[in-house]
Amino acid sequence: MKNRVISLLMASLLLVLSVIVAPFYKAEAATVVNTPFVAVFSNFDSSQWEKADWANGSVFNCVWKPSQVTFSNGKMILTLDREYGGSYPYKSGEYRSKSFFGYGYYEVRMKAAKNVGIVSSFFTYTGPSDNNPWDEIDIEFLGKDTTKAQFNWYKNEVGGNEYLHNLGFDASQDFHTYGFEWRPDYIDFYVDGKKVYRGTRNIPVTPGKIMMNLWPGKGVDEWLGRYDGRTPLQAEYEYVKYYPNGVPQDNPTPTPTIAPSTPTNPNLPLKGDVNGDGHVNSSDYSLFKRYLLRVIDRFPVGDQSVADVNRDGRIDSTDLTMLKRYLIRAIPSL
């Protein structure tokens, strides 16, 4: 009898432990990226990303619709608009990675939406939907005042770490880079390559997905202000980067604007400027992809040789890769 009681007690203990440990085991067993990751938003890559097609409920007064995540001129665009005949008055977009990411440096280049009652965001998240504890790290822009960025994080559903940073510019007027370095004992937040804040309490531990969304609030007027129903509103994103080893020392965060390389002789054509507008930017990248996919058979620029970025006498995917590396500042010039 004594042995049987002990056996029953041990079985009960193992069952309890399995309930406690299981969610954390699943987090560790998920696909966690541990190599550098760069996504330039020229098109929808369904192998790495997904468009949300559901509603979060709670304070989110919208339903996520894939139609509200679009791509144009080298940008991913989230659009908040009216929703007719549905359970929610508004529809908007959420874009999220399929893989999970852990400690490291995360960066986005984006332009926030401006309007009272809304939020534009860049964040990592995992939670009960992934069979994980709720861990999250946020960079959010409250549309009522886009001269500030709000930093926050959650560990096992516990937040309360909000910090409002004065940017010194309006995040809705132009593209800027925002990032954070997540480590076991701190989170450093960056704006345009400069570290602006460090958090050290209650740091999250569970790898999460990279996410971006745009949404109107409900029941949070004290925080966001009362949404006035204005539509459409858009937040725009150019790229996302992740470096597991932290901020790259030999590849600093991009500056707010992309400066095209200038030939020594101003009469020479500009390498990579395939649309002939005198600049090398995401528009050229989009045109280059259309050319390689045979959607177009010529570039708008007169001198087609500008597309031979690596000067090997061919126009192919190697040139496109080099152009991409230039746009994300992995190389200084073309």
Swiss-Prot record:
Residues annotated as the enzyme's active site: 136 (nucleophile), 140 (proton donor)
Keyword Signal: yes
GO-annotated molecular function: licheninase activity
GO biological process terms, semicolon-separated: polysaccharide catabolic process
Species in which this protein is naturally found: Acetivibrio thermocellus (Hungateiclostridium thermocellum)
Organism phylogeny: Bacteria, Bacillati, Bacillota, Clostridia, Eubacteriales
CDD domains to which the protein is assigned, alphabetical: Dockerin_I (cd14256), GH16_lichenase (cd02175)
Recorded catalytic activity of this chain's protein: Hydrolysis of (1->4)-beta-D-glucosidic linkages in beta-D-glucans containing (1->3)- and (1->4)-bonds
Database matches in Pfam families: Dockerin_1 (PF00404), Glyco_hydro_16 (PF00722)
Name under which the protein is recorded: Beta-glucanase
EC top class, as a word: hydrolase
EC number: 3.2.1.73
